[in-house]
């Protein structure tokens, strides 16, 4: 199975073709470029990886709202500022993404899973962690990856570093940014990410207050040592975080566990994700795609119709 993080792949295309997108005169032209780039990219993944990972493609998209932001309002709070500084027309970007999600639902042969409060990587994590034995699905979603993970080889298409914690013998990751497989450096564990936080998502390290990335700071954040990472690891695995660490640090450890550890995606989301895929009804067909591409004058996509 090939699991595609829709937003991640879509934005990789936008940044790679930023000059072409900047020349778009209106939304229609922008979406035309976006459609062509996205579909060509997905087909390239299918052609490149299907022999090893199979021809099943599932697309995971970000839903409205975000459960993490409800628990931690500063989560990804600085993203809007970064977008403003990019020079891109983000109204065009988001409109094109919405258009393509709807086209995937109605025209193309791939399931797209989008649920309220969930990010695409949440959907991917739940699908990857799904036990091979269906009867265990309700009670044991998050069995350790590896032999108790997915029965088939799975490729995650995403540049998101959070996906590293899903790697196993049968689960690999391909980055649309670097166009290469993602590897894990020796000694890396999820406990390092918990201790250090995730600057890209606005999650500070366990020494820093919640608003570290949203307010001017008088100095650099206090560094997190390997010794501290080891202590965090031991405290979490032994269930002694609140005993070992001062109250403020312990609270931040729990904050970061909830924000970055995919084993802590709330269980209320597990069944809806799995049922969304299991009960998904594909509406697309080659006939509908052919009519659509002819109407758009998308000759290059029309020529690749048999590859969908």
Positions of PLM-derived features:
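Short, polar loop motifs at secondary-structure junctions
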Residues: 158-163
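Noncatalytic, basic helical substrate-engagement surface that gates or grips nucleic-acid strands
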Residues: 1-155, 168-181, 261, 267-279
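Non-catalytic nucleic-acid-binding/docking modules located in mid-to-C-terminal regions
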Residues: 47-61, 78, 82, 88, ...
């Amino acid at each position: 199975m090939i699991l595609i993080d829709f937003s991640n792949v879509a934005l990789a295309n936008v940044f790679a073709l930023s000059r072409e997108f900047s020349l778009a005169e209106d939304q229609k032209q922008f979406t035309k470029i976006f459609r062509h780039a996205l579909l060509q990219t997905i087909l390239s993944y299918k052609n490149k990886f299907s022999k090893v990972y199979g021809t099943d493609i599932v697309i995971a998209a970000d839903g409205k709202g975000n459960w993490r932001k409800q628990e931690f309002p500063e989560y990804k709070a600085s993203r809007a500022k970064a977008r403003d500084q990019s020079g891109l027309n983000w109204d065009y970007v988001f409109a094109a993404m919405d258009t393509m999600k709807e086209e995937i639902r109605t025209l193309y042969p791939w399931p797209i899973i989008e649920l309220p409060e969930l990010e695409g990587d949440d959907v991917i994590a739940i699908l990857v962690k799904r036990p091979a034995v269906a009867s265990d699905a309700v009670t044991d979603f998050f069995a350790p990856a590896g032999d108790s993970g997915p029965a088939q080889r799975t490729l995650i298409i995403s540049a998101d570093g959070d996906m590293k914690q899903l790697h196993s013998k049968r689960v690999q990751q391909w980055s649309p940014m670097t166009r290469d497989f993602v590897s894990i450096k020796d000694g890396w564990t999820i406990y390092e990410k918990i201790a250090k936080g995730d600057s890209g998502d606005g999650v500070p390290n366990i020494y820093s207050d919640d608003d570290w990335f949203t307010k001017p700071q008088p100095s650099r954040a206090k560094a997190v040592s390997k010794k501290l990472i080891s202590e965090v690891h031991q405290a979490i695995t032994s269930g002694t975080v609140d005993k070992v660490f001062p109250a403020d640090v312990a609270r931040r450890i729990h904050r970061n566990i909830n924000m970055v550890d995919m084993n802590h995606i709330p269980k209320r989301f597990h069944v809806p994700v799995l049922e969304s895929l299991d009960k998904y009804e594909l509406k697309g067909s080659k006939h509908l795609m052919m009519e659509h591409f002819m109407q758009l004058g998308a000759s290059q996509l029309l020529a690749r119709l048999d590859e969908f």
